[in-house]
Structure formats: structure tokens, C-alpha cells
Amino acid sequence: MPAHVCVTCGTQFAPSDEPPPGCPICLDERQYVGAEGQQWTTAEELRETHHSRVEEIEPGLVGIGVEPSFAIGQRALHVESLLWDCVPLVDDSVVQAIETIAVSHPHYYTTIVDWAERFDARVLLHEADREWVMRPSPRIEFWSGERRRISDGLELIRLGGHFAGGTVCLWRDGAEGRGVVLSGDILQVVSDRNWVSFMWSYPNLIPLPAAEIERIRGVVESLDFDRIYGAWWDRGIDADAKAKVLRSADRYLDAITRGRGAGLL
């Protein structure tokens, strides 16, 4: 039986003879159903029309994407033996070893089970987002709390926000030892790469409340890092990233609580 993949978000579902009646990920207000309605494909069909894009981002960090762009269009990152976030096209030629897969939030779960089976890897997902797993597997381990250590140099940090279990990965050895945050779009690097933003729903432009931004800001303030890599090839902050995230949180709070930055003051 095929494991159907949603064309709009890239989420893979448990094998079935017929496609699911809909995609809960896309029916949620944080995503959307495509203008042409619900459409499905499979990993096998995807391999016939798409290929992997692999690039070194910095020493020790490799980006993995899909071309032409498919679904949300994010790219994954490989560091040490960790695959951070996921892309729908599984390709065992792009990296040598994956022991652990960790994902920032459900929009990037995609084909995590296929990747885990191909590399004999475990998958770490925050338990707060358990309901969004569309293809259960014994390889999936749900972690709880605010932090989960993967190795001496890698740690998962729950930031929440976009999803309750929204996670970033702290890579302590990155940026020549100054520290890197792999953020997905939990911290969304915007077009002006001196800033990030935060949203409950990006495609539908639904903001987060002030209390959640203040909480996220407090967590970020406790971390040591100088660089951020977001979910897309061109979205990163090369230096002074922590200060820029904190400044971005302050700007966001000004905009939603006092109207500053919106021409209201």
C-alpha cells in the first residue's frame, strides 16, 4: 500500500489503499489547503520528478533540499549524525550517517519515517505535538520538558510559539565555536536578515500574543549563540544573532502592544 504524501505541505501518512479524506496539517489554521484542493502524491512519484540539492553551509553543516521546490520548500540540515528538520525526498546518497532525526515542528515532519528506516535512525519529536504525527512508527521517541541533549555539542530547546512543541537546535561548536541556532521557522529569519519574526500562522498572518513572545524572549536570552540558520537556503543571520533576536522580540512587542512601528504612535 502506498504512503500518501500531501502535495501542499509534504506530510506523509500511514500506508493505505486510498488517500486520506483530507490533511489535518493543512486544515489547521497554521497551514492551508491549496487553491486546487487537496492533492496527493507518493515518495516514489516524487523521485521521478525531483532531485536532491546538497550544499555545505559551513564546516560541519550540510544543507539538503529538494528541486524543483516541493510543498513548503524548506531544506533540512545535517550536523554530526543529526538530521535537523526534514524534506520529503529521501536520498541516502546525500549524507554518510544519520543516527537521530529531530524536527522543529509538524510542518516539517514530512517523510520522517522513510528517512528513519533508510538510515536506521531514531526520531525525536516534542510530545506537545504528538497529535500531528500522521504516520506513527516505533522509531519515533517523544521527549518532554524544555531541553533534550543529543550530544555534547547538540541540544534541543523547546521555544513553543508557532506550535506548542516548537523546537530549535543549539549547535555549540558552530560558527567557529560561537554557537549556532538551527531555528526552522520557530524563529523566522525575515527578508532583512538583521531581524526575525514570530507567528502562530505564517501563511494566514496570525500573530502570537505578547505573553508568548515574552516567554520565548526569556528562553533565547538564556542561550549562547552568534548565528542562526533558518528553514530556507537564503534565510540566516551570520553574526550577532542573539542580540538581533532579542531586539526583534522587543520590536514585535512594541507593535502588538503599543502600536509602535505601525504608524499608530
Predicted regions and their residues:
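Short, ordered loop/turn segments at secondary-structure junctions
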Residues: 106, 128, 233
